[in-house]
């Protein structure tokens, strides 16, 4: 079984990754040397633990965003996704079919003046069985 990593190791590794992301990689030995250069770590054992966790996190970061670590590259990617504007607006269609509840919500959001709204009755998509014993 693996060992439990302390709060100190995890916090130190996260800070090192946020500040020195470009100098780190997936290799433990290079990460160990980088940790030795940039931080004052009191013992060899602690340095190795931090470098090991840095390596572990770097592998996870390559697969996707990691909670608790904010890297400039990931922040820019998230901004791009959040600010995405589609080529054709959903409101530019000829007829937009909505149910009565959606029509009411659009009125409350001051979109009630849209001329291409067509109110349709919602179709019940699920077949609910009668309860047993009835």
Curated annotation (Swiss-Prot):
Its main location: cytoplasm. It is found in: Cytoplasm. Keywords: Cytoplasm, Ribonucleoprotein, Ribosomal protein. Signal peptide: none annotated. GO terms for molecular function: structural constituent of ribosome. SUPFAM superfamilies: Rps17e-like. InterPro entries: Ribosomal_eS17 (IPR001210), Ribosomal_eS17_CS (IPR018273), Ribosomal_eS17_sf (IPR036401). One of its GO terms (biological process) is translation. It holds the Pfam family Ribosomal_S17e. One of its GO terms (cellular component) is ribonucleoprotein complex. NCBIfam families: PRK01151.1. Component of the small ribosomal subunit. Component of the small ribosomal subunit. The ribosome is a large ribonucleoprotein complex responsible for the synthesis of proteins in the cell. Belongs to the eukaryotic ribosomal protein eS17 family. This is Small ribosomal subunit protein eS17. It comes from Ictalurus punctatus (Channel catfish). The lineage of its organism: Eukaryota, Metazoa, Chordata, Craniata, Vertebrata.
């Amino acid at each position: 079984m693996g060992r439990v990593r302390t709060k100190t190791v995890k916090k130190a590794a996260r800070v090192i990754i946020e500040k020195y992301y470009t100098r780190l990689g997936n290799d433990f030995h290079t990460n160990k040397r980088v940790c030795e250069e940039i931080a004052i770590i009191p013992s060899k054992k602690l340095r190795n633990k931090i470098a090991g966790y840095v390596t572990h996190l770097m592998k996870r970061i390559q697969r996707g965003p990691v909670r608790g670590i904010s890297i400039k590259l990931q922040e820019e990617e998230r901004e791009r996704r959040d600010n995405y504007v589609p080529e054709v607006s959903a409101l530019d269609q000829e007829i937009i079919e909505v149910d009565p509840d959606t029509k009411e919500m659009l009125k409350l959001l001051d979109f009630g003046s849209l001329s291409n709204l067509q109110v349709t009755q919602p179709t019940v998509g699920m077949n609910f069985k009668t309860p047993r014993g009835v």
